[in-house]
Amino acid sequence: MFLAKSIVCLALLAVANAQFDTNYASGRSGMVHLFEWKWDDIAAECENFLGPNGFAGVQVSPVNENAVKDSRPWWERYQPISYKLETRSGNEQQFASMVKRCNAVGVRTYVDVVFNHMAADGGTYGTGGSTASPSTKSFPGVPYSSLDFNPTCSINNYNDANQVRNCELVGLRDLNQGNSYVQDKVVEFLDHLIDLGVAGFRVDAAKHMWPADLAVIYGRLKTLNTDHGFNSGSKAYIVQEVIDMGGEAISKSEYTGLGAVTEFRHSDSIGKVFRGKDQLQYLTNWGTAWGFAASDRSLVFVDNHDNQRGHGAGGADVLTYKVPKQYKMASAFMLAHPFGTPRVMSSFSFSDTDQGPPTTDGHNIASPVFNSDNSCSGGWVCEHRWRQIYNMVAFRNAVGSDAIQNWWDNGSNQIAFSRGSRGFVAFNNDNYDLNSSLQTGLPAGTYCDVISGSKSGSSCTGKTVSVGSDGRASIYLGSSEDDGVLAIHVNAKL
């Protein structure tokens, strides 16, 4: 028995270690969540923008059939009707083509998968034509029957782990992942996505499922499809949605042995800092000292589709596209700092927190409109197309694994640091100018500041920085400038 247990433990360990690898193509980093985009539009974006600008991955909205809800809110996609690949974003053929096209240009696909639950009452028909009866827990499109669900009960006490994991989240019919038939169906669904070439999954509502059940499901998944450029034996990267701000019965540490987690404390803390509630000087020990999970277990972000709307965690401290100067600074810091696996949010604009994506007719999702300066219109925000963000993805790629060096701060809200001898950033969140001679760590030369502009041939469309033979440079960041950050790196040398 002891031997059998040891073998099981070793097997889980092997599974776990593989599941922390993002499976990114070499020389790339950073993923973007193209929230509610259509598959055909994502494929084109991989080819036209994400690939050429060094992005490593794209997180996509749920790919499986969901309940059609009145006024088509964004959250209808988190109400599954079946595992057929038919949504407002497109069908299976379009999704498969998207994954293939993105992989071909070095951009990996990560699917937001929902298998904690099925649709709540009122979700009687789906985007793929299936019908269901959530009130009787009948979902013939899978098929699931009442035998596959936990008994109906509500979650109202987050200090009771049994209730959080066995009862229904806001009325969503709660699947029993300990049931072998449910496990079979979930594995079948995820394996099908692996066959199509995806690199990993964001597991929605992982906190509401038992870690032991998830370990079984993850452990049964097939290895990634080598036809799509993955190394033989590669496992899907798994990032689990576990909101753990402390003080509840369930901790992210119960899940970090199985895969990475969505580190909501990062979002909350970075928001407080760049909103001026904490000083930038305190960022000197950014990382686990702030209560975050280990770096390779942390998917980090400034905001996500939930908390930008006040759902999830972080409340009013969360930064969004609606406060662009601070948002760009926080995003630049996240991308400049080596901690965690960063994910950039790409939103549609909203005034109502239930509002769905832009449509052509109230139902069919509209494609983003691209402007000459790379930005989007037509109701899409496209933060990933803001120069201050996509140029920092290139910065992250340029500095690689080089460590933070040459930390400087003014004892308040002005900081700077280098990433070895390959990149340098400075931030000013004070209400007075930053004007100092700082050690950049970089070789002598003239560099293009990739925040105010971009390198174009041998010139720069923004500010330039002259680094002396001693590595020092005069750094000026006016408090009233559009951007409170400056960044230079070896690939932006003129």
From Swiss-Prot:
Q: Which UniProt keywords apply?
A: Calcium, Carbohydrate metabolism, Chloride, Disulfide bond, Glycosidase, Hydrolase, Metal-binding, Pyrrolidone carboxylic acid, Signal
Record site feature (Transition state stabilizer), residues:
306
Phenotypic consequence of residue 405 to P: In strain: LO4
What catalytic reaction does the record list? Endohydrolysis of (1->4)-alpha-D-glucosidic linkages in polysaccharides containing three or more (1->4)-alpha-linked D-glucose units
Any idea of its EC number? 3.2.1.1
Task: Give residues annotated as binding Ca(2+).
Answer: 116, 165, 174, 208
Gene Ontology biological-process entries: carbohydrate metabolic process
The secretion signal range is 1-18
Q: What class of enzyme is it?
A: hydrolase
Question: Which CDD domains does its entry note?
Answer: AmyAc_bac_euk_AmyA
Q: Which GO terms describe its molecular function?
A: alpha-amylase activity; metal ion binding
Which residues does the record give as chloride binding sites? 202, 304, 343
Subunit comment for this entry? Monomer.
Q: Which family is annotated?
A: Belongs to the glycosyl hydrolase 13 family.
What's the name of the protein?
Answer: Alpha-amylase B
- Species whose genome carries this gene: Drosophila yakuba (Fruit fly)
